Amino acid sequence: RISQLFIVITLLVMYGCATTPQQVGHENAHYLAKDEASKYALYAMMASNAYLDPSRTYFPIEELGWVRVDLDGNSTTGNSYSPRTWIGSMFSNLQFDIWEHKDSNKTVISFKGTDEKIDWIVSNLWIGPSVPYKSAKKHVKEYKEKHPDRNVVVTGHSLGGGLALSSSLWLRIDAYAFNPSPRVFDGWKDHKEHAERKVIYQEKEVLSKVRSFWPKFKEVMNEENIYQTNFEYNGVSSHRADYLAEGLLRCSTNNNELKEFANKVTPIKVSCGLQ
């Protein structure tokens, strides 16, 4: 473990030395165009909402026709799934939301990331098998089998983004990941089922430099599907899920529903800034 932590610290130091605009992570990533933001804003808001952190912006997407349900399909205000006991949480910190749209057959499963200081490195950069990744895939598969009529998409931020990408590789479902962990597991047989997989990250976000040379991440993600944003966070951590989501929402002026919804999200912490 000490050697692994040394590697991680070295990588983060390397990231800290990257101060020029060209050294922002993924060398060939595209800057996200303003008129593309509306494609990803909803997923980013769901990824952010999974934290249920009262100190951060909550996006009331219920007003857009979405309902968070538990594993039995009942409306819930908490995460759809969390470990049932403290013993279970020791082996897996998996938490996720199931969002079902009331007027369509669309479902979005949003995996919670982690921003606890103690387990942040372990969750995002640890090397080796991971119980949360296996459990995430199992739960998505079970939902699809139980609801074959629904169109399922996965999303997540940080560790949650890694869980979403891994589930997509195994189960052939579209995935949208925000500031994701570089850890992506596709199994011994290198499962790479065809699906749309997109990564959106804020420039100089702490994991971007690591993802840019993490072997498995580079193998499964083409840089043509990786997009960088340059929102102004005014000194707040560039890894924040709610700031990235708000920036994308503020830029969604080509979608009337999202444009109107953005006016309800206050106070304004992030402006658009994309071109």
Give the ranges of each region predicted by the language model.
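Hydrophobic membrane-insertion alpha-helices, especially the h-region
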Residues: 9-11
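Serine hydrolase/lipase
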Residues: 19-27, 103-106, 173-275
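Short glycine-enriched nucleophile-adjacent loop
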Residues: 165-169
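Gly/Ala-rich beta-loop-alpha elbow adjacent to hydrolase catalytic centers
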Residues: 155-160, 164
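A conserved cap/lid and substrate-binding interface adjacent to the catalytic center
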Residues: 19-29, 38, 42, 51-154, ...
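Bacterial N-terminal signal peptides that target proteins for export
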Residues: 1-6
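C-terminal motif of bacterial Sec signal peptides marking the signal peptidase cleavage site
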Residues: 13-16
